[in-house]
């Protein structure tokens, strides 16, 4: 599934659409270059999950847990060395929605069943390409495609 996003509001709106469909145990991986809109999309997800207040980038904290209709774990692995251990970050929790920016730093340690949102610059906007690995997130992607 692809979506063209004309501006940051469209990126946040896609995040809200995704967030409205998420349930505990879902894992969403956000990929894209610096400035691609990962954190903007994450903020949209957070709003749809009922997170109030500021949703900062977790770049320096690595993981920030937010309270909402379900807990949201928002992680940013950018500062980690590739392959660095992440077992103690709680990214395998099934009682929360897990949202990971820069998952390529340690993809092998993340849940195998997940949704990927790849953001790319298109000059006058962005393109979001969504794909799922595993049956649970394939069902999520099918629901988002309707």
Where in the sequence are the language-model features?
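Conserved nucleotide-sensing/catalytic segment adjacent to the nucleotide-binding pocket
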Residues: 56-59, 65-105
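Conserved lysine of the Walker
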Residues: 38
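Hydrophobic anchor at the beta1->P-loop junction of P-loop NTPases
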Residues: 28-30
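N-terminal pre-Walker A segment at the start of P-loop NTPase domains
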Residues: 1-17
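P-loop (Walker A) phosphate-binding loop of NTP-binding proteins
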Residues: 33
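Phosphate-binding P-loop
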Residues: 18-25
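Short phosphate-coordinating micro-motif centered on Lys-Gly-acidic
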Residues: 1, 84, 92-146
């Amino acid at each position: 599934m692809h979506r063209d996003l004309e501006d940051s509001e469209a990126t946040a709106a896609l995040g809200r659409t995704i967030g409205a469909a998420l349930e505990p145990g879902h894992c969403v991986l956000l990929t894209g270059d610096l400035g691609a809109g990962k954190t903007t999309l994450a903020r949209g997800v957070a709003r749809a999950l009922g997170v109030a207040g500021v949703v900062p980038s977790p770049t320096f904290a690595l993981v920030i847990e937010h309270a909402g209709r379900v807990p949201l774990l928002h992680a940013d692995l950018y500062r980690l060395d590739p392959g660095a251990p992440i077992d103690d970050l709680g990214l395998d929790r099934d009682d929360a929605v897990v949202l990971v920016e820069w998952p390529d730093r340690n993809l092998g340690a993340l849940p195998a069943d997940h949704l990927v949102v790849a953001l790319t610059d298109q000059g006058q906007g962005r393109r979001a390409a969504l794909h799922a690995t595993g049956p649970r997130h394939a069902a999520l992607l099918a629901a988002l495609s309707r």
